[in-house]
């Protein structure tokens, strides 16, 4: 559908969708074809290109959530509490849900109305939801198998009844441009002969301290929360809920907000110690501020949030692999153009935390801005053509070398390996790992083979899981020589095939099957027309 947005002089914002009004019996959600919002400037409402407009029965949802079991008391697939979630295509997906707090119990006692949950689809094991509910409303992410993430977010602040359901891929990044920078890039990659696990399937809980400078807090203020403290913490909880959904499933890493994180929500710009609007300066300041307020021994990693006085959002990590490292574990910061933290901004912060956990950039582009900025390209981990598309890529920010818009919510194989090494045997191994009942899956990529030039091919893996869990497969090219982009068929080195979303099928066609059938040539999946060697790795999840 194409939304129509009208802004009148009386600040009346009208949202219209082409979908007929709907009401599902017994549902928490009602579909709307139009919504009028009073008192909001256009800049406060950033709309995806396509969306589904909804009204939520808040009281009914609150009653349902009060019955959700605690995570420690039930397996997710055995929860009897069911929640229908509206998808952008007009359908609903039913999830079994349970509590999944991201705040330390002591912090949760101080803010009992801020809560987090997780769920698994009743009919598709690849659909997972991670959401939070608080006085600022419902904020949720659904991870799907092939369509990319779905988000359900409030239309505007101070309205907990009206929501948008949309695919992240339909969010126009030009509305909220993002930028990343990192220092100490350029480390060598782990040996590519490694064929083991990206992790050991043990859960590692890291104590996370998120600071919000006074400008971020003030921008979070509303009529019901004039100081902005509660809203800022609720927004941070939204962010960590979504990040945990990815970090837990990809890395068996859980982030938990420290017991006194509320002390890091500042309200006085004259005394908070931050240089708002400058992420690099804030990242350096954050270390001393957090150490001084909560103590260096009371957290494992920290990141500061501020407000960007210009356009868009920008983040930085002053180092690669700083988690658990006294003296540098708080040297990360992001300044945002929207304190509601849109999905793109949360992905940016997820990316910066990836640096703090030991991952480098994965893009191969070396000439297009912003990819060509000094110190950002790391040849040792440049396995993705162009801008790349995974979390540690520069998707959407590399001009003509953009593979796609928003980053996909998974890590490239090299990032999994870097972070896995860092938290198991490297400097990020400070938490005591918790054994889980989940067994490691096994996978076999098969043998090597030779094919004629310019010939489509397929790779097939064989996977097994002792627990009977549904598996996904992700085939990725593992050649990192720097080349010209888009890749050419005459390239004798470097990546010529992009990564694709993990799939339930163990088979990947190169290029993708629809283009093979149609006889077209995808820009980011290029068959070599000359003799060369290509390396591939498959990751099973």
Question: Which stretches of residues belong to each language-model region?
Answer:
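Extended, hydrophobic interaction surfaces within ordered domains
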Residues: 15, 145, 150, 154-158, ...
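Bacterial Sec-dependent N-terminal signal peptides
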Residues: 1-25
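A broad, structure-centric signal for solvent-exposed, well-ordered loop/edge residues
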Residues: 7-8, 104, 126, 366, ...
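Zymogen propeptides/activation segments of proteases
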Residues: 19-283, 461, 473
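A broadly conserved detector of short glycine/acidic/proline-rich loop/turn motifs that flank catalytic sites
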Residues: 10, 101, 123, 144, ...
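Extracellular (secreted or membrane-anchored) zinc-dependent metallopeptidases
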Residues: 198-539
